[in-house]
Amino acid sequence: MENRWQVMIVWQVDRMRIRTWHSLVKHHMYVSKKAKNWFYRHHYESRHPKVSSEVHIPLGDARLVVRTYWGLQTGEKDWHLGHGVSIEWRQKRYSTQLDPDLADQLIHLYYFDCFSESAIRQAILGHIVSPRCDYQAGHNKVGSLQYLALTALIAPKKTRPPLPSVRKLTEDRWNKPQQTKGHRGSHTMNGH
């Protein structure tokens, strides 16, 4: 019998991102209880030697599986030390690969609070609108007009620790330009 190959999309990430992801998932599963019904599978529970963990997130009758890997072929950059993440959506016998943005949106559909449809009417009537979105990563780029109006009205509260975001897990933080907060230039060069 000949070998059959399967190709999977694996996002290269650094080891510390994976540790942060594990920590956030476990915190919200066991401490805050916001990720109820999620299932965490350790590396020793997997039959594949390169799988370091799996997080199963139920989405109705389907589920999202975020699988982390170790011992992969290193990438072209020095920090790609053989760690990666795959994101898979499964329903019965069907499965497909997802990108991190879509995974975060699917998680947002089933978990974590957001504005209700009646919130804008309550805001117009002058009532206090208390529901806020806890899961900012689930909103893709620019939100709807309703969402933008409500975020202008109520600043979202900071959740400590933050909720686990698949997009944040797979984000490439080295190839982004560095941003310095609050510095307009050198004080000695400006003469101040």
Curated annotation (Swiss-Prot):
Write out the residues that bind Zn(2+): H108, C114, C133, H139
Q: What are the boundaries of the region Membrane association?
A: 171-172
Phosphothreonine found at: T96, T188
* Stretches the record annotates as Multimerization: 151-164
**Region of interest called Disordered, as start-end residue ranges on this chain:** 159-192
Mind telling me how this protein is modified after translation? Processed in virion by the viral protease. Highly phosphorylated on serine and threonine residues.
Region (SOCS box-like), start-end ranges = 151-180
Per its UniProt entry, which superkingdom is the organism in?
Viruses
Q: What is this protein called?
A: Virion infectivity factor
**Native species:** Human immunodeficiency virus type 1 group M subtype A (isolate MAL) (HIV-1)
Q: Could you read off the lineage of the organism from its UniProt record? A: Viruses, Riboviria, Pararnavirae, Artverviricota, Revtraviricetes
